[in-house]
Structure formats: structure tokens, C-alpha cells
From Swiss-Prot:
NADPH binds at S88, K89, R257, G258. This is NADPH-dependent 7-cyano-7-deazaguanine reductase. It comes from Mannheimia succiniciproducens (strain KCTC 0769BP / MBEL55E). GO terms for cellular component: cytoplasm. The lineage of its organism: Bacteria, Pseudomonadati, Pseudomonadota, Gammaproteobacteria, Pasteurellales. It is found in: Cytoplasm. Pfam families: QueF, QueF_N.
Length: 281
């Protein structure tokens, strides 16, 4: 399926747009998850049973009743079972529309964002706003696990290729549980081709996955065009197909753009983690 021949034509992403300073929920634009899941064969039933698109919104401001500007940071969780994901530029424009709008308090802003995102996503959305003083305890974290990035390998082909994972467990004779991490994940925006930089954590139980093959596979996303959420679901499906682990979690955290970072989490056995902040976020 060519995504750009369908509903993505109407997205504001990659187009010149006006910045609206007064609240307007219609600025939010959905992207059907089925556009990517159809190609993966997982539209009706996903191989993961837990998941969310975890967003951090750093640029939220509104006016209080007296007209004094207020600021906050938001944690947002959009359930993986929602019909749509939220297009990121539209989310940015939507948040900007709060700038010159009066709200009674932070709770009203939080409730408004939660309701609007739920309608756009057609699914469950959780929103938690934090004052800057309450956010001051947040520290730079790191993904737990063994980092693959120091492997001494040579790469000359950067085209996406899931078949790199073929026979990735052929040398394994026992079931292991391990957590693997790479900070070399890079893909490109589906619409604008702008680079998206991320770190990925893979926690699995099953036959041991060849570390070199896995790193080569992750690097092959380097010139691949897909949204963050779609990349994580593709990684999950490819590992399931070629490694067949009993348990699997794929969690990626991408760098911030437009005051937003997007951090998709998919698992068949672990709960959604508390939002954190990596070094590049």
C-alpha cells in the first residue's frame, strides 16, 4: 500500500501552515494505524497485547483567568488499540492553539487535551500535566541492558532488509532472557523524509538472537521512511517472525522535535513503563 496515495494527503506535515493562537481541537489530525498494520498483516490481531505511544510534550502554555500565562509539561499515553495514531505536527499546532486561551486551572487543560486526543485517536488516552516545580525531580535515565553499539562490524548497505534476521537463532541451543539496547536507530519521517533519531530497547525470552544480525537489522532502518510508531511495530513483527521468542518487548525513545518526543512501547508480557528521559531527549 502506498500511504501517500491515501489519507496522508491531507496532513499538515510538510506543508506551510498558519499558527493558530486560540484553542481549536480541529487542528488534530489522525493517521489510521491500519495503513501500516495492513502491510504487516496485523490489523485484526496484533502480536503484542500491551502497548502505548508515550509522548512527552514540553511546550504547553495557556492563560489563567486573569490572563497570566501558565506553562506545563505533559505525559501522554495513547493506547495501541486506538484506531488512529496522532500526527505529530498537528499535535504541535493543536497545543499552540492553547497559547492565548483562558482556562480556569491546569486540571481543565489536562481534561481538555485528554478528551480531544481520545476523540482523534478513537481510543483510550491518558494525559498527566506537570508543573515545572513538580518536574524538577526528573533526571536523565538510560536504557537498562547490553548495548550492541560497540560491536566491531562493517556495514556498506543501508537499505531496509528484514531478511537480515533470517536464521538469527540458528546457533542457539537454549532458552535465554536478555535485554539488548542500541542508540543507532535512525529512520526518516514518512512525509518529509526528515531524520528521526532514536534509542531502542529489546527485552525477550527465547532462543538467543545473534547480536550482530540484530544490530545490522536495526541499522538498516537508516534510510527507511515510516512514522515512529510504525517502525516499532515493524521491528516487533520482524523479530517475532524470524526469532520466534516466547516473550518480547520493543521500546523506542526518539529525540524531540517541535517540543514533542514520541516513544512507542509494545509487549506481550510487560506493563507500560513510567515515562523517562534519555540523554538525547
Amino acid at each position: 500500500m502506498d500511504y501517500k496515495d491515501n489519507s496522508l494527503k491531507t496532513l499538515k506535515l510538510g506543508q506551510k501552515t498558519d499558527y493558530i493562537a486560540n484553542y481549536d481541537r480541529t487542528l488534530l489530525q489522525p493517521v489510521p494505524r491500519a495503513l501500516n498494520r495492513d502491510g504487516l498483516g496485523i490489523t485484526k490481531q496484533q502480536p503484542f497485547s500491551v502497548g502505548a505511544d508515550i509522548w512527552t510534550a514540553y511546550e504547553i502554555s495557556w492563560l489563567n483567568i486573569k490572563g497570566l500565562p501558565q506553562v506545563a509539561i505533559a505525559d501522554v499515553e495513547i493506547d495501541y488499540r486506538s484506531t488512529n495514531l496522532i500526527e505529530s505536527k498537528s499535535f504541535k499546532l493543536y497545543l499552540n492553539s492553547f497559547n492565548q486561551t483562558k482556562f480556569s486551572d491546569m486540571s481543565e487543560v489536562q481534561r481538555t487535551i485528554s478528551e480531544d486526543l481520545s476523540i482523534c485517536a478513537e481510543g483510550n488516552v491518558r494525559v498527566q500535566l506537570h508543573s515545572l516545580s513538580n518536574y524538577s525531580h526528573e533526571r536523565i535515565a538510560d536504557f537498562a541492558g547490553e548495548c550492541l553499539d560497540e560491536l566491531d562490524i562493517e556495514i556498506s548497505d543501508y537499505g531496509f532488509n528484514a531478511e537480515i534476521l533470517q536464521n538469527c537463532t540458528a546457533l542457539s541451543t537454549e532458552i535465554v532472557e536478555e535485554t539488548l539496547v542500541s542508540h543507532l536507530l535512525k529512520s526518516n519521517c514518512l512525509i518529509t523524509s526528515q531524520p528521526d533519531w532514536g534509542s531502542v530497547q529489546i527485552h525477550y525470552q527465547g532462543k538467543r538472537i545473534d547480536h550482530e544480525k540484530l544490530l545490522r537489522y536495526l541499522v538498516s532502518f537508516r534510510q527507511h521512511n515510516e512514522f515512529h510508531e510504525q517502525c516499532v511495530e515493524r521491528i516487533y513483527c520482524d523479530i517475532m517472525k524470524y526469532a520466534r521468542p516466547e516473550k518480547l518487548t520493543v521500546y523506542a525513545r526518539y529525540t524531540r522535535r517541535g517540543g514533542l518526543d514520541i516513544n512507542p512501547f509494545r509487549s506481550n508480557f510487560e506493563a507500560i513503563p513510567q515515562n523517562l528521559r534519555l540523554a538525547r531527549q
